[in-house]
């Protein structure tokens, strides 16, 4: 997907980027490739692949109407090089974005990136989601939590649902279907106060399959969750 094809594909969803936004995506690509030589950010560095598998894929929640042009708060867990939250932030500057990442080198990259792109209202937090999830400054404060290919849903639910306000939504982006994962995660989602709402299946313009699971927080998460760092992955709720 060339940059022009990216713009054209967004136009199909009635999204027209300004010259500034086009330049922001271009600079994003340049910095991603430049920093990827210093720290491991992505295996995808070819320009057309970045525009397809990182930029276009990241903005799917906007394309499919899950996130609209409103000043809502989004927490991105394990965003790595800023996906999916920062491409969405470029398209909808009103979004208030917070990113948690456990690797300080990635936070340094994201700090430079947001400064270079002129992105405001972006908060970068270095640490583990399990620790921040017990912090009253962040717990139950977000409208959305996004996670792109971070962990199986049974584990991801514990990382993410505690951060959501009541009626907030977890948007989990994956390449594969969620059917088996949902069966495994059903109990965890319920215990944590969530409810599976729907799964959106779609294809990238090259035909690759993608899925977004939408889980809404219906009630407060019990205080014991998330458990201490490392426990959810080692011992998922069953």
From Swiss-Prot:
Binding site for S-adenosyl-L-methionine: 78, 83, 129-130, 148
Main location: cytoplasm
Annotated region (Disordered), positions in chain: 217-238
Domain of life: Bacteria
Enzyme Commission number, as recorded: 2.1.1.-
Signal sequence region: none
KW Transport (keyword) present: no
InterPro entries assigned to the protein according to its UniProt record, in alphabetical order: rRNA_ssu_MeTfrase_G, SAM-dependent_MTases_sf
A matching Pfam family: GidB
Molecular function in Gene Ontology: rRNA (guanine-N7-)-methyltransferase activity
One Gene Ontology term, aspect cellular component: cytosol
Compartment list: Cytoplasm
Top EC category: transferase
Keywords, comma-separated and alphabetical: Cytoplasm, Methyltransferase, rRNA processing, S-adenosyl-L-methionine, Transferase
Protein function: Specifically methylates the N7 position of a guanine in 16S rRNA.
Family: Belongs to the methyltransferase superfamily. RNA methyltransferase RsmG family.
HAMAP family with a match to the protein in the record: 16SrRNA_methyltr_G
Protein name in the entry: Ribosomal RNA small subunit methyltransferase G
């Amino acid at each position: 997907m060339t940059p022009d094809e990216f713009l054209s594909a967004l136009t199909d969803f009635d999204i027209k980027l300004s010259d500034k936004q086009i330049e922001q995506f271009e600079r994003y690509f340049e910095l991603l490739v430049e920093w990827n030589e210093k720290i491991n950010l992505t295996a995808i560095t070819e320009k057309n692949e970045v525009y397809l598998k990182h930029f276009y894929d990241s903005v799917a929640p906007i394309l499919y109407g899950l996130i609209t042009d409103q000043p809502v708060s989004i927490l991105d867990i394990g965003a790595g090089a800023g996906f999916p939250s920062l491409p969405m932030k470029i398209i909808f500057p009103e979004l208030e974005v917070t990113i948690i990442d456990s690797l300080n080198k990635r936070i340094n990259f994201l700090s430079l990136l947001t400064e270079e792109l002129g992105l405001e209202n972006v908060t970068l937090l270095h640490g583990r989601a399990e620790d921040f999830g017990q912090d009253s400054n962040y717990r139950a404060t977000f409208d959305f939590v996004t996670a792109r290919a971070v962990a199986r849903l049974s584990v991801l639910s514990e990382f993410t649902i505690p951060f959501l306000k009541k009626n907030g939504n977890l948007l989990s982006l994956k390449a594969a279907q969620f059917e088996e994962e949902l069966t495994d995660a059903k109990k965890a989602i319920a215990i944590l106060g969530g409810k599976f709402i729907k799964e959106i299946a779609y294809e990238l313009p090259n035909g690759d399959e993608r899925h977004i699971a939408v889980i809404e927080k219906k009630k407060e998460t019990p205080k014991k969750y998330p458990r201490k760092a490392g426990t959810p992955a080692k011992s998922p709720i069953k």
